[in-house]
Every structure is written in structure tokens, then in C-alpha cells.
């Protein structure tokens, strides 16, 4: 079920930069958003289907650089990361988790972004 929900969110939500702390109902209505919107909607749908889900926040390595990113983890006997923006299940090793919790915790990471020094070996 988690894979089908991830696939649906990936296909149905237009990838568009958004500055907000979204809720799932708004995302369902607008059908657009960035990683925050995708994650909030995926988590709500997964939980409605009886699958424990949580938000994780960190960075992802894309096109030669690290960028702020949010994605989901679902409980499938262990916590498994998945990314409904990048269509990954499980999410690959380019995802570096800094914290978990709901989207409103992302403020805790903002002071790190821009000050991080990450070396890819």
C-alpha cells in the first residue's frame, strides 16, 4: 500500500516550489507543491491506510550539490525512507536525515543550511 500511495502522490501533485507549512487537505485541493507538500500528503494518506508514517528533514544530493529536503519514513517492520518527490522507494543514500517530526520542525534545520560543510567521498 505504501508504494501505491507514493506512486499516486508522485503522479498527482505538480512539483512546484512553495513557501508554506502545508496541511494535507490544502495539498489535495491545490494539487501542487514541493517536498513539504508531498511529504505531508503522503503521510496523511499512509496513516489513513493504517501505515505509520513520519516526516524526516535533511538534505539531498542532486546535480552536484546538497539541497534542503523533506521526505517520509514508513513503518514496515522497520522504518523505511521513501521520497514521493523523487519517486524513490526506498529513498537512496543521497538523503541525509537531520531530524524527524512534523513539517513545522523544519525551522530547527534552517540555521544549519548554508553553514554545512559536507564532503562527498
Spans of features found by a protein language model:
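Active-site rim recognition segments
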Residues: 7, 11, 66-121
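C-terminal extracytoplasmic interaction modules
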Residues: 3
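Active-site neighborhood of thiol-dependent amide/isopeptide-bond enzymes
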Residues: 6-70, 74, 90-91
Amino acid at each position: 500500500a505504501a508504494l501505491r500511495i507514493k506512486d499516486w502522490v508522485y503522479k498527482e501533485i505538480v512539483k512546484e516550489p512553495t513557501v508554506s507549512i502545508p496541511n494535507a487537505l490544502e495539498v489535495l485541493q491545490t494539487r501542487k507543491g514541493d517536498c513539504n507538500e508531498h511529504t505531508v500528503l503522503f503521510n496523511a494518506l499512509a496513516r489513513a491506510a493504517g501505515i505509520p508514517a513520519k516526516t524526516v528533514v535533511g538534505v539531498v544530493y542532486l546535480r552536484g550539490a546538497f539541497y534542503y529536503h523533506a521526505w517520509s519514513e514508513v513503518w514496515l517492520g522497520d522504518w523505511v525512507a521513501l521520497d514521493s518527490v523523487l519517486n524513490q522507494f526506498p529513498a537512496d543514500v543521497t538523503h541525509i536525515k537531520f531530524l524527524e517530526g512534523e513539517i513545522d520542525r523544519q525551522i530547527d534545520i534552517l540555521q544549519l543550511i548554508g553553514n554545512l560543510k559536507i564532503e562527498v567521498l
